[in-house]
Regions:
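Beta1/beta-strand and adjacent pyrophosphate-binding region of the FAD-binding site
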Residues: 3-17, 33
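Short hydrophobic core segments
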Residues: 10-12, 187-199, 343
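Active-site substrate-recognition segment that forms the wall
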Residues: 23-24, 52, 81-84, 187, ...
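Glycine-rich FAD pyrophosphate-binding loop
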Residues: 26-46
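Dinucleotide-binding Rossmann-like beta1-alpha1 core, especially the glycine-rich loop
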Residues: 49-126, 286-287
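Short beta-strand to alpha-helix junction loop
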Residues: 63, 91-100, 138-157, 273-278, ...
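Helical element adjacent to the flavin cofactor pocket in flavoenzyme catalytic cores
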Residues: 138-181, 186, 190
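C-terminal catalytic lobe of FAD-dependent flavoproteins
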Residues: 273, 280-281, 287-372
């Protein structure tokens, strides 16, 4: 098969980030082509927990989260999102973990996110199933959980109804001057936005991206055990750490009564097989925080690959040295939260508009000159 077609923007990748870019581009009146070799909303979007969270480990990360969470409000109204505002309860297992809580609460308040410190009594009032000996934590009431694959599907479906052209089941083989060549021989002409997560280096080999494998377990349905997304205070350190393999406590109640148990991180592991020893460590960590999980039956486990940059911030913006090539990828574990904001920032910049946030911290050029 061969042929040429011209488009205002060619978006490669239809995970949650790519799908959000498609929506923003179509809303701006662009003639959009979407290329997706696998399932829409597949990859990291399908493997993720679906936690909408104001992550405050880095000011640029937090700014992107807050901007994106505002833009999630419309998507959250869709039945496909399975949106549940369960809130996040950050749990301190050690007394010293409480030392930074007041500063975190203040930092969140500065960007309009309400959070409150809780002592041990308040912690157990919110979640009685926690193990004895916890010291307190932080409660962020407006955080939520969603089901990302169906959101991505709806975004692409609505975009196609509005005129976007979907090239499904075909791989983008190579970027060419002025467009992209597909594996079936067709050539799409126009500016290109690469949003393929861990696969970005296949088209942009000069852009560093590490695959960070994660595993999750889903339980059987059961009477309510937990009401909040529970995360240990040390989660951010594990998420941004450089350890080859790590686990941290992270459990999410799903709207249907199941529990989603995480999380693990492994760098540079390409096998899609479950890592039994790391899975055991992850479950033992969860049971140490919620002993009742020992009696809950696990239904299945799976893994996915987070696209990770060296500095923990995504790549958003034009690619230096390449004409009319843009990128939106590298969100690691925050792609679900950050998708709508990332998309709007990139499309605004593509159109020459002033984005709501400065793109400077996220520009891919930082990785090419060694800043990231």
């Amino acid at each position: 098969m061969s042929g040429h077609s011209r488009h205002d923007l060619i978006i490669i990748g239809a995970g949650i980030v790519g799908a959000a870019c498609v929506e923003a581009a179509v809303a701006a009146g662009l003639r959009v082509a979407v290329v997706e070799s696998g399932a829409i909303g597949g990859g990291a979007s399908a493997a993720a927990m679906g936690h909408l969270v104001a992550m405050d480990g880095d000011p640029h990360e937090l700014a992107l989260c807050v901007y994106s969470l505002q833009r999630w409000q419309r998507w959250a109204s869709w039945p496909e999102s399975e949106h549940q505002r369960c809130g996040t309860l950050w749990v301190a297992r050690e007394a010293q973990e409480l030392e930074g809580v007041s500063a975190r609460v203040a930092a969140l308040a500065e960007v309009g996110v309400h959070a409150e410190a809780v002592d041990a009594r308040g912690l157990y009032a919110l979640e009685p199933a926690l193990a004895a000996g916890m010291h307190g934590g932080m409660h962020v009431a407006d955080d939520a959980v969603v089901y990302p694959p169906r959101v991505a599907w709806r975004l692409i479906d609505e975009a196609c109804r509005a005129g976007a052209q979907l090239f499904a089941g075909v791989r983008a083989q190579a970027l060419i001057d002025g467009g992209v060549r597909l594996a079936d021989g067709r050539v799409l002409l126009g500016p290109v936005l690469v949003a393929t997560g861990v696969a970005v280096p296949e088209l942009l080999p000069e852009l560093p991206m590490r695959a960070r494998k994660g595993q999750l377990v889903i339980t059987e349905r059961q009477p309510p055990l937990l009401r909040h997304q529970l995360i240990e205070m040390g989660y951010a350190a594990a998420a941004h750490g450089a350890d080859a393999a790590s686990v941290s406590f992270n459990v999410q109640p799903r709207p249907n009564g199941q529990l989603l148990i995480g999380s693990s991180r492994e760098y540079d592991v390409t096998s899609t097989d479950i890592s039994p020893l790391l899975l055991q460590r992850m479950l033992q960590r969860a049971i140490a925080f919620v002993p009742a999980l020992r009696e809950v039956r696990a239904l299945r486990s799976w893994c996915g690959f987070r696209p990770a940059t060296a500095d923990g911030l995504p790549y958003l913006g034009p690619m230096p040295g390449r004409r009319d090539v843009w990128v939106a990828a590298g969100h690691e574990g925050l792609g679900i939260t950050a998708a709508p904001g990332s998309a709007q920032l990139v499309i605004d910049a593509f159109l020459g508009r002033a984005p709501a946030l400065s793109l400077s911290p996220y520009l891919p050029q930082r990785a090419l000159r060694g800043d990231a």
